[in-house]
Amino acid sequence: GLKQQPDESYLSYLSRTKTSKLWQTKDNALYDLTRDGATDLNRKTSLNPNIVYKTYTAEATHPTLIGKQKADYNMFLPFTVTGNVIGKATEKEWRENDGLVSVISSQHPFNQKYTQATDQNQKGIWQVTPTKHDWDHVDFVGQDSSDTVRTREELQQFWHSLADDLVQSEKLTSEQKAQA
């Protein structure tokens, strides 16, 4: 692994880490977050007719004068760099993002069925919820203590709606199991 060994010098540790096979593999989250990685991942997956799929999308960028996207001032600080890099993508539709993921990538796999989410969950199809504007990737988990835009009540309401969705999804899948 990448953990420094007890008797290993810091320079030896850096050297070993730099030459790790991890950097040559595509089996990691960093690769999955790239367009090529997401495309590869989507090709390998299919929809299960018995599973409820729902996506939650955020965006926290704004257009610049030259048509790129720039991180909003309230974006989680560590994600402003990646947000700005994504915002310079060659293809315009890939620029709007939440600091880690492009909006277009977070909605649904291109090769699979999708629909706009409603109050009624469905199985076997991606249900795309409306994009949450001025939300960054961290807002979904409430870990940005410096965020002055999201209120505690707003986050709690979001999490309660997720819990309600999970209960509804469980009922939907349980009903099918009972009928089988």
What positions do the PLM features span?
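Helical cap/lid subdomain of alpha/beta-hydrolase-fold lipid enzymes
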Residues: G1-A180
